[in-house]
Design a protein with these regions (language model features):
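N-terminal type II signal-anchor transmembrane helix
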Residues: 1-6
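N-terminal cap/lid segment of alpha/beta-hydrolase-fold proteins
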Residues: 9-34, 39
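Tryptophan-centric aromatic hotspots in well-structured domains and transmembrane helices
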Residues: 18-20, 78-79, 126
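Structured segments of extracytoplasmic/periplasmic soluble domains
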Residues: 68, 108-111, 137
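Active-site loop/oxyanion-hole signature of alpha/beta-hydrolase fold enzymes
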Residues: 84-122, 126
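Conserved hydrolase catalytic core segment
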Residues: 116-143
Length: 143
């Protein structure tokens, strides 16, 4: 199997029948909700979690990554934060707190199995702030 074949091979992956999409339950002070993620590619050595701007924007403008990350062999994850895109949309203003969003990123990271040896955060605008705050409060540092 060539490099390209291995990159696109989803056999044995729980999300293989959904095109890489899955919903992840997250716990908040207002109860349990779910957020949407989508995996692209297959690389156990390098995984990138993409954090969109906003809050309230969606992952869609980050789909430009489809133009270059696959060619580099990078496994990456789109993710709509709570209250945006395909994720749950709770009507609770108290959930719009920076610390709560940082905790959400940690819950998503853990559910996706992203560890300190293979995990990079890419954040744009608000997502960049989340990435910085995650790095400052995380029990491990990401690359």
């Amino acid at each position: 199997m060539g490099v390209v074949d291995g990159y696109w091979d989803s056999s044995g992956r729980a999300d293989r029948l959904s095109g890489g999409s899955r919903r992840i339950p997250i716990d908040t002070p207002s109860g349990r909700f779910s957020v949407w993620t989508k995996r692209v590619g297959n690389n156990s050595d390098l995984k990138v979690l993409l954090l969109h701007g906003g809050p309230g924007a969606t992952h869609e403008y980050l789909e430009a990554c489809d133009s270059y990350l696959p060619a580099a062999g990078v496994e990456y994850y789109y993710y709509d934060q709570l209250g945006s895109g395909f994720s749950d949309q709770p009507d609770d203003p108290s959930l719009w707190q920076l610390d709560r969003f940082v905790d959400e990123v940690e819950q998503v990271r853990a559910a996706l199995g992203l560890g300190p040896d293979n995990f990079v955060l890419y954040g744009q605008s608000w997502g960049g702030l989340l990435a910085i705050m995650f790095e400052m409060t995380s029990p491990f540092s990401c690359a």
